Amino acid sequence: MMALLQTFNHKGIRQLKYREKIWQVVSRIPRGKVATYGQVASLAELPGYARYVGYTMKMLPRGSKLPWFRVVNAKGELSFPKHSAQYQTQQEKLEAEGVVFSEGRFCLRTYQWMID
């Protein structure tokens, strides 16, 4: 039983560290720029964890100030189902920062955050 508890605690601590790394990267994405899930994972030193980045964004507490909406997929699209409330919210927030959409997409080359 004690070994199981230690394993759980270790896994929980590791996941918290992963989330903190992801949050730090996302907090640095500038206004008017986006980063892909894979890019955030790589910058957080978690290569191959793109899906975990998505999960972490999904689990943000309501009212979080983290700019979750700046994290997008590698196709230059939003990952929410089109016409959903979440899709509309994300698109509106990005457009308010100057990201231009055309037919539900934007030019990733133009808006992708590149670290100097």
Per-range role (PLM):
Residues 4-116:
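Nucleic acid-binding interface residues in structured DNA/RNA-binding domains
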